[in-house]
Amino acid sequence: MEFLSPLRYPGGKAKVADFVQCLIKENALLDGTYVEPYVGGGSVALSLLFNEYVRDIYINDKDISIYAFWYSVLHESEALCKLIKDTPINVETWHKLKDIQSNKENVDLLNLGFSTFFLNRTNRSGILKAGVIGGYDQTGNYKIDARFNKDDLIKRIQRIADYADRIHLSN
């Protein structure tokens, strides 16, 4: 399975993307619009868009942290990718970015979006309120960077940004 979303959602909707593609094709709905009211990682929407099953996708998420991430991907992708490239992946950074989630109203969308992304990639099961992979002392079987391949994640974000004119975001 090709991973399209930069976000981790184990047990998410990605596994139904092929089924939704089949539904669209069998019901002659190709080249239409797909609406995702709770986008999360957005794997189904991205699959439909990248494989040209739909012309446009409308994505929404009530959670301002998730919205901020997608806003950053679509409107500040270069700055987001620079943050990903330049930010060290360690527990000290994790604590700083975790604090941002407690003060969402006092931070701009780019920094909130990056915090959301960083925690999603470094927390157990991608859950924003969970603890760090490997534990605070990093003695677990997996370390904080186990799910954080910077080059691959930047490529995913850049690919999505290339479709920004066909992705409509709301909160």
Where are these regions (language model features)?
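SAM-dependent nucleic-acid methyltransferase catalytic core
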Residues: M1-I24, L29, V73-N171
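Conserved S-adenosyl-L-methionine
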Residues: L30-E92
